[in-house]
A protein has these predicted regions:
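N-terminal cap/lid segment of alpha/beta-hydrolase-fold proteins
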Residues: 34-84
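Alpha/beta-hydrolase-fold enzymes
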Residues: 186-290
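Conserved alpha/beta-hydrolase "acid-adjacent" motif
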Residues: 346-352
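Cap/lid segment of the alpha/beta-hydrolase catalytic domain
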Residues: 96-97, 123-147
């Protein structure tokens, strides 16, 4: 650790101490809030660790914990307030992410630098958000995610309006990163808005066009939570006992989840690559005789409940379908949508990007450098974003 790093570290500790002692930084607005300061400290250190171009951006962060209907605990909210801003961007995190990531803050600073305030939310697939039962049972289900995001935003504006008067009068725009970008695109196509906020623009950064990525992450979480053992070659692999344990966990998760599905949600499963996770669950549970009840549940309750009913063989055949983009397939994007995408993003194939580019035309900017979201650090990105957002009439940037 070099001297400059040490100096920055000690400065951050000093600032954290000062900020944590200031009630205006993290004022709990929910009764019986047990942990007002640890998250404030964490958010401050994270913000300082990001090499912001403008110190004013770092110091503008205000962190709240907001009570949202249906949530078991307060929702963390990051608010970068830009004095005099007439428009606020709601920025949605990527799959399982929160606004404390450097990429999130790089994008937030770009918005802030151009004269916008930024309201940051954790991903609907992150535990901080998924305390609402439906998100917890089915992460990645866009209709439920968007409904809960809309309700959360309405509650956030209502609860913070007294402390942040600008949020009661501001205009609004919606932006998202990765999975949050997919939610942004879906919201731009919604016939009925999910929030009372009326978004004037939608900006998506690297939207993954295939939900199978998110669903595979869900499956992997079961495996990572299982005990592993060392092989003679020194690698860690799941033991048979851990596989059985993972199978039992899957059995409990999927049986409880599927039992709560409506007909509309079951049709959603058929339309998306989510079905592959179900097939993997069937495969894993078949290793343990105690899990046969889950297979029985699928065959006797789930599959016959579909209209028309499906056999297990017919269900398995569905994995060969090649249409993972159903919700975004038929309706052209409105002119208020802007997409930035990295050509070497691992979450979307060249075919996907070409398909999206064809539908968006000049509304889409492609970048080759930097890897997944690495382009957010480039001068070209800053310039393109500034030019693209100029119709929203922000204040001049610093």
């Amino acid at each position: 650790m070099g001297p400059r790093t040490l100096i920055r570290f000690f400065k951050s500790l000093t600032l954290v101490t000062l900020v944590a002692s200031c009630a205006s930084f993290d004022t709990p607005i929910v009764e019986n809030d047990e942990h007002p300061f640890p998250e404030a400290m964490f958010a401050t250190v994270s913000s300082l660790a990001y090499q912001a171009r403008s110190p004013a951006f770092t110091s503008s962060l205000v962190h709240y914990r907001v009570g949202v209907k249906g949530f078991r605990r307060p929702l963390p909210v990051w608010y970068w307030k830009r004095p005099g801003a007439k428009l606020t961007f709601v920025l949605l995190s990527g799959y399982g992410g929160t606004p404390d990531s450097s990429v999130f803050q790089a994008i937030a600073e770009n918005f802030w630098d151009q004269g916008f305030s930024v309201l940051g939310l954790p991903s609907s697939t992150h535990p901080d958000f998924s305390q609402a039962a439906s998100s917890k049972r089915l992460p990645g289900h866009l209709p439920r995610d968007l409904k809960e995001l809309g309700e959360a935003l309405d509650d956030v504006r209502e609860r913070l309006g007294g402390r942040e008067p600008d949020l009661a009068t501001t205009r609004w725009a919606l932006a998202g990163i990765s999975y949050g970008a997919l939610q942004t695109l879906q919201e731009s196509l919604a016939a009925t808005p999910h929030s009372s906020l009326r978004f004037e623009a939608y900006v998506a950064f690297n939207p993954p066009l295939r939900l199978s990525y998110a669903m595979s992450r869900l499956d992997e979480s079961f495996e990572r939570g299982a005990p592993q053992h060392l092989t003679p070659t020194g690698s860690l692999v799941p033991s048979m006992a851990s596989k059985i344990h993972a199978a039992q966990t899957r059995q409990l998760y999927w049986s409880e989840t599927l039992a709560a599905f409506s007909q509309e949600e079951l049709e959603f499963l058929l339309a998306w690559d989510f079905r592959k996770s179900l097939l993997r669950a069937i495969s894993w549970t078949s290793q343990d005789p105690r899990s046969l009840s889950f297979g029985n549940y699928l065959q006797t309750q789930l599959l016959p409940s579909l209209n028309p009913p499906l056999t297990l063989d017919q269900w398995s055949a569905l994995q060969d379908l090649k249409d993972p983009r159903n919700p975004l397939e038929s309706t052209p994007y409105p002119p208020s949508v802007l997409v930035f995408h990295s050509l070497n993003d691992p979450l979307s194939t060249a075919e996907d990007i070409g398909w999206l580019k064809q539908r968006l035309g000049s509304q889409m900017q492609l970048y080759r450098q930097g890897g997944h979201l690495g382009y957010v650090w480039s001068e070209r990105f800053r310039s393109d974003l500034r030019a693209s957002l100029s119709p929203l009439n922000p204040m001049p940037g610093n």
